[in-house]
């Protein structure tokens, strides 16, 4: 059984017991979080597709940890001008373990 849900402006395909990284959520590690924007649920041949969300669909997960991703370098370079600008960015994430899928 798997589901597709939306969190942080992105869609994630998850199965029960899977660990996934999401955009940062303000929930303490060890607590439970519920996602109700479920777009699709599949249980073998039984597939429910929402318009846009599945009615009564819910994905529950336990927050494992918070952290920051790898650094992404941003470089702006102007040729022949002796001008270069360099910056970096590390995005915050929340790692969750999927504990249940309900449809």
Curated annotation (Swiss-Prot):
GO terms of molecular function: rRNA binding; structural constituent of ribosome
Keyword Lipid metabolism: no
Keywords: Ribonucleoprotein, Ribosomal protein, RNA-binding, rRNA-binding
GO biological process: translation
Disulphides: none
Gene Ontology CC terms: cytoplasm; ribonucleoprotein complex; ribosome
Job description of the protein: This protein binds to 23S rRNA in the presence of protein L20.
Subunit structure: Part of the 50S ribosomal subunit. Contacts protein L20.
PANTHER family, per the entry: 50S RIBOSOMAL PROTEIN L21 (PTHR21349), LARGE RIBOSOMAL SUBUNIT PROTEIN BL21M (PTHR21349:SF0)
Family: Belongs to the bacterial ribosomal protein bL21 family.
Name of the protein in question: Large ribosomal subunit protein bL21
Species whose genome carries this gene: Alteromonas mediterranea (strain DSM 17117 / CIP 110805 / LMG 28347 / Deep ecotype)
